[in-house]
């Protein structure tokens, strides 16, 4: 075989063929269309060698088997027919692997996803390592697609239809022990003996498929199947609100294969794959995938980052505890927490303990590994142990004088090279750095709550922040598992600035008589994970509204909240979920009780009359203000590019991923159409809906953001 081949064949002395997967020049193995000829050439050699006893597929990469198919292949398809042909090519290749007359085993270490799992499913047996890096799944639904190389047909027959549907519909990834329990793999072994274990399995007859559990056998029959697909269909429709066509097609294709046989199933799979590849939802989801990949590669500045050997955190509250957890347990960097109250340190340590202990209980982590990670976190009530910290993250109250004091203390007690990163959500970084002796080492690092779950961070340099400080902070965020966007030091930064008018409009509609549940349901139907009122309750009404006066002072009355509404709510001791009462009432702590709207909220805020708006009208008012503000952020270079703007909105506030972010959504509607909608709303509801100048100009010229914009902050 050629040296540049991604698949190479070697035959051992015991007549076991080893096919090594190693895509040249890439960290991850991904399947490309041009590899088909390489695999077919190997299959031909295997068929011609009558001495062979078995075959093993193994990866040469240190941490992945095959991470999936190369998504660029789909983008290169111009029609549904071309994408369908791509799927049929994949199906045929997998069928040829499966048709080999000798046992074929997949030796899996690391990520085995998408097309990688489909290749493993085409093998007659699978062995995987017990390493935490080893995960198996079919995540195509997250790109608005379905598995196109036989996965929708082979997986249900191997592990049962209900379990397979859960995996395919959600993109759920299984760890090794889960995969073994479900029958997805035949054995789990240490990495050091993976190849030998796979070879031993290949020397035996083809592994016989293990009998499915009784429940799965019942569900595979006509009556059980009809009941299952009806129930799963309802549940899926409720979860997706009909916004993700891939889920409907997955159900259709899996059911076709079970009811009409694999031949019909494969045919339906290929056709559905081709059609889904051309949907705007899949195109938007793939754009988010590519954009997030680019952001993760972006170093933030041209300067080399400084070393990061240890980090300090000021404040042991909820944010401080979460930041300590991702720094120690995700980034693997030693962390020291300073809090004036020993109880604060204990809370922060308990935060990490709870996260890690949950992983131990779910068998995702060994107790010894938990203890090793916890040992990276320590605490103090003074600055002992801070002298040589490379970066300090401040997570204290939103008070400018306090944060300036923290800067002074860090400069006095830490090394000359130490970076000071403030987790402020609203205060200008330039003001925090105003009295610093080393202002070039002061930067904003805005996490979102809950820290361990929210993927986005905003990195905010002020005018005097050095390029190396930016690069080092970006480096830390990536190590913490975050997707960082660099934003300009202007009031509200980016995410809170586009979120505030969206929340304000929801509150304004409440005062006009719209119901809480109706507003929230309208935005969930639009595609947000939760509605704006529920979001405010979850964040904390006191916390979430604190930024409104800051934004109003900076940008004028378009950011003003309805008069006295917020103060009335806060004066009634309503903070949201954290104290059990906000717009909603919550059950006892520790119980998963249903929240319900508190009817007392309406007289409290002076709501009058009955709501008259439809769900689309409610969503339109909230979303249009968000879009308008996002365009202003591009115009003012608050964000470096529309790419960052889309990623920030999707990862920071849950803007519907299937729409691709605010800028792709504007492009899909057309800037001219957005301007027309906003002008109509301005006539009906006031000047806050006046479209910004940039949007009007683009509408007049018929321009779109993703084709014309490439702004960069200097």
UniProtKB/Swiss-Prot annotation:
Catalytic activity: a (3S)-3-hydroxyacyl-CoA = a (2E)-enoyl-CoA + H2O; a 4-saturated-(3S)-3-hydroxyacyl-CoA = a (3E)-enoyl-CoA + H2O; a (3S)-3-hydroxyacyl-CoA + NAD(+) = a 3-oxoacyl-CoA + NADH + H(+); (3S)-3-hydroxybutanoyl-CoA = (3R)-3-hydroxybutanoyl-CoA
Stretches the record annotates as 3-hydroxyacyl-CoA dehydrogenase: 306-714
Compartments where found: Cytoplasm
Keywords: Cytoplasm, Fatty acid metabolism, Isomerase, Lipid degradation, Lipid metabolism, Lyase, Multifunctional enzyme, NAD, Oxidoreductase
Family matches, as Pfam families: 3HCDH (PF00725), 3HCDH_N (PF02737), ECH_1 (PF00378)
Gene3D superfamilies named among the record's database cross-references: 1.10.1040.50, 2-enoyl-CoA Hydratase, Chain A, domain 1, NAD(P)-binding Rossmann-like Domain
Region (Enoyl-CoA hydratase) location: 1-190
Superkingdom field: Bacteria
One GO term of the biological process aspect: fatty acid beta-oxidation
Keyword Secreted: no
Pathway note: Lipid metabolism; fatty acid beta-oxidation
GO terms assigned for molecular function: 3-hydroxybutyryl-CoA epimerase activity; enoyl-CoA hydratase activity; long-chain-3-hydroxyacyl-CoA dehydrogenase activity; NAD+ binding
Residues the record marks as site: Important for catalytic activity: 118, 140
Function: Catalyzes the formation of a hydroxyacyl-CoA by addition of water on enoyl-CoA. Also exhibits 3-hydroxyacyl-CoA epimerase and 3-hydroxyacyl-CoA dehydrogenase activities.
Assembly, per entry: Heterotetramer of two alpha chains (FadJ) and two beta chains (FadI).
Family: In the N-terminal section; belongs to the enoyl-CoA hydratase/isomerase family.
PANTHER family given in the database record: TRIFUNCTIONAL ENZYME SUBUNIT ALPHA, TRIFUNCTIONAL ENZYME SUBUNIT ALPHA, MITOCHONDRIAL
Protein name, UniProt field: Fatty acid oxidation complex subunit alpha
Organism: Escherichia coli O157:H7 (strain EC4115 / EHEC)
Gene name of this polypeptide: fadJ
């Amino acid at each position: 075989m050629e040296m540049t081949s991604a698949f190479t064949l070697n035959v051992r002395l015991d007549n076991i063929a080893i096919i090594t997967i190693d895509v040249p020049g890439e960290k991850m193995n991904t399947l490309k269309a041009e590899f088909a000829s390489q695999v077919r050439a190997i299959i031909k050699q295997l068929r011609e060698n009558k001495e062979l006893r078995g075959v093993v597929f193994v990866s040469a990469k240190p941490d992945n088997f095959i991470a999936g198919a190369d998504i660029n292949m789909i983008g290169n398809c111009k029609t549904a027919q071309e994408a369908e042909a791509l799927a049929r090519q994949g199906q045929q290749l997998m069928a040829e692997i499966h048709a080999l007359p000798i046992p074929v085993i997949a030796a899996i270490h690391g990520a085995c996803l998408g097309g990688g799992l489909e290749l493993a499913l085409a093998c007659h047996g699978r062995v995987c390592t017990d390493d935490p890096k080893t995960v198996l799944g079919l995540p195509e639904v997250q790109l608005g697609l379905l598995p196109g190389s036989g996965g929708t047909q082979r997986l249900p027959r191997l592990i049962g239809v209900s379990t397979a549907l859960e995996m395919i519909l959600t993109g759920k990834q299984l760890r090794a022990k889960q995969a073994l329990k479900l029958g997805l793999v035949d054995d789990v072994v240490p990495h050091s003996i993976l190849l030998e274990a796979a070879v031993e399995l290949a020397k035996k007859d083809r592994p016989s498929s293990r009998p499915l559990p009784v429940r799965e056998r019942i569900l595979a029959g006509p009556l059980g199947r009809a009941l299952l697909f009806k129930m799963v269909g309802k549940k899926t429709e409720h979860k997706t609100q009909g916004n993700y066509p891939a889920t409907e097609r997955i159900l259709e294709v899996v059911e076709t294969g079970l009811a009409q046989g694999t031949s019909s199933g494969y045919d339906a799979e290929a056709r559905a794959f081709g059609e889904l590849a051309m949907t705007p939802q899949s195109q938007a989801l793939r754009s988010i995938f590519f954009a997030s990949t680019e952001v993760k590669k972006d170093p933030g500045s041209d300067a080399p980052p400084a070393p990061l050997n240890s980090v300090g955190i000021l404040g042991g509250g909820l944010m401080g505890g979460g930041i300590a957890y991702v720094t120690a347990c995700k980034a693997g960097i030693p962390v020291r927490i300073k809090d004036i109250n020993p109880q604060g340190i204990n809370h922060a340590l308990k935060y990490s303990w709870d996260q890690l202990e949950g992983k131990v209980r779910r068998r995702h982590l060994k107790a010894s590994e938990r203890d090793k990670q916890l040992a990276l976190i320590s605490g103090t009530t003074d600055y002992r142990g801070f002298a040589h910290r490379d970066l300090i993250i401040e997570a204290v109250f939103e008070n400018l004088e306090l944060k300036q004091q923290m800067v002074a203390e860090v400069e006095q007690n830490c090394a000359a090279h130490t970076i000071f990163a403030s987790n402020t959500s609203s205060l200008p970084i330039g003001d925090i750095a105003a009295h610093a002796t080393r202002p070039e080492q002061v930067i904003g690092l805005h996490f979102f709550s809950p820290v361990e779950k929210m993927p986005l961070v905003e990195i905010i340099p002020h005018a005097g922040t050095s390029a190396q400080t930016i690069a080092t902070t970006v480096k830390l965020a990536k190590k913490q598992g975050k997707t960082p966007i660099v934003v300009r030091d202007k009031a509200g930064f980016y995410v809170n600035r586009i979120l505030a008018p969206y929340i304000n409009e929801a509150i304004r509609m409440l005062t006009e008589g719209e119901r809480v549940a109706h507003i929230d349901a309208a935005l969930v139907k639009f595609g947000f994970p939760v509605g704006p009122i529920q979001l405010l309750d979850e964040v904390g009404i006191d916390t979430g509204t604190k930024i409104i006066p800051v934004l109003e002072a900076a940008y004028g009355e378009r950011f003003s909240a309805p008069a006295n509404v917020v103060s009335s709510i806060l004066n009634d001791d309503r903070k949201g979920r954290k104290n059990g009462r906000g717009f909603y009432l919550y059950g006892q702590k520790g119980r998963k009780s249903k929240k319900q709207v508190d009817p007392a909220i309406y007289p409290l805020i002076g709501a009058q009359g009955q709501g008259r708006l439809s769900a689309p009208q409610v969503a339109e008012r909230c979303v249009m203000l968000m879009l308008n503000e996002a365009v202003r952020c591009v115009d003012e270079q608050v964000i470096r590019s529309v790419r960052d703007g889309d990623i920030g909105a999707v990862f920071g506030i849950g803007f519907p991923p299937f729409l691709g972010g605010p800028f792709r959504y504007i492009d899909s509607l057309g800037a001219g159409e957005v301007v027309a909608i906003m002008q109509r709303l301005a006539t009906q509801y006031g000047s806050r809906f006046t479209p910004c100048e940039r949007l009007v100009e683009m509408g007049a010229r018929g321009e779109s953001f993703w084709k014309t914009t490439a702004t960069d902050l200097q």
